[in-house]
């Protein structure tokens, strides 16, 4: 299985485990509630949205990553179009982060 597919699979598992926040507002809320472990940005997310979330995440020491996965790819697994995904579980966050680093 290629790395991109593995990342998408882990995102799907995190969704089933209710360990995701999907979208900008949900990510903000998770960051401010200190439940965010990792923020993922889609490859086609606007720079403005990315910068807005990165500012808040950096203040709370939450890691952010831009993936090479598009919003439409995320939509297939989440059934919702989203460019910002917040992982709220440290195990899922570590595995996805490792896979993203391998992919680079």
Description of each model-found segment:
Residues 1-4, 102:
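N-terminal targeting/trafficking signals and adjacent low-complexity tails
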Residues 5-38:
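N-terminal first-folded block
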Residues 14-15, 58-59, 77-80:
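Short glycine-enriched loop/turn motifs at secondary-structure junctions
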Residues 25-30, 48-74, 100:
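Positively charged, polar, low-complexity stretches
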Residues 37-38, 63-65, 82-85:
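Structural motif
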Residues 43, 68, 89:
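Short secondary-structure boundary segments
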Residues 71-104:
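C-terminal structural segments of small proteins and small subunits
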């Amino acid at each position: 299985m290629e790395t991109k597919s593995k990342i998408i699979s882990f995102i799907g598992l995190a969704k089933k485990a209710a360990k995701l926040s999907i979208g900008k507002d949900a990510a903000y809320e998770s960051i401010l509630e200190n439940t965010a472990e990792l923020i993922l940005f889609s490859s086609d997310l606007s720079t403005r949205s990315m910068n807005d979330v990165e500012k808040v995440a950096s203040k709370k020491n939450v890691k952010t990553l831009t993936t090479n996965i598009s919003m439409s790819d995320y939509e297939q697994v989440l059934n919702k179009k989203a460019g910002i995904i917040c992982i709220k579980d440290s195990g899922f966050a570590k595995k996805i982060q490792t896979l993203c680093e391998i992919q680079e």
